[in-house]
Amino acid sequence: MSNTALTQLQEGLTTAYIDGTVAANLAYKPAFVSNNPEEGKKVISVIEDELMKCDQFQISVAFITMGGITPLLQTLKELEKRQIPGQILTTNYLNFSEPRALKKLQELSNVTLKMYDVDRADQGFHTKGYIFKKEEIYRIIIGSSNITSAALTKNKEWNTKIVSTEQGEIAMEIVKEFHQLWDSKYALFYDDFYENYKQKYEIIKKQREIAKRDEIASTEKYKLEPNSMQVGFITNLRRIVDAGENRALLISATGERGIFVTGGRNPGFTRVSEAWS
């Protein structure tokens, strides 16, 4: 690394962590990355900028949707033309990532896509990290933003952009962690996960649509009423209790009736403890 680059990095660290009044080159300064419409700031703008400047990139996020990758596709296709390699790791966590979005990424010749199987690994996976390397410098965005439209453009998201040499401890630990996840036996290549994941995704999608469409049943609408046999039992039960008896026997043809009768054996009592078993 040149002395000039090292000096600019030190100045950037000073501005970010010691004295905000010190002038520094923005390219070497750690930063808070968020969506702020009033100031015209968007997470996606920072990611696009870093993608266009890097020599290689790695991304690890829990969720990827079409709304998230669509505005990035032009940039990613430009990187494809320039043969800038990228690795993207996502998950089947909550079956939220959209198969269409994953297929779009797979179609890029410069991008290798993997999915971490949280079910087989028996652990959650909620990382949101974007690693960009140019020459000997890493610029890493870590925080709360998945690759979804809302997360990259309008949600309240908190991310930190780290700038480090490749020998920097934090950068080394983050890159090491990424490679450990990427090389894990639970990280599956596209051809090994896509069809199975797509089937599960479509099933769950239909279930969600049905759940949204069907109204919640009203307890008033479906209020249970005793049938004639049960009414007779309740009447006789009251007589037995009023006579001071504490035992009775009901023989019913079906278990359902027994359950309903049991639920209605205390009519008129304000407390269950006042009735007998």
Show where each model-derived region lies.
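PLD/PLD-like phosphodiesterase catalytic module centered on the HKD motif
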Residues: M1-G244, E274
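Walker A/P-loop
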Residues: V61, A243-P267, V272
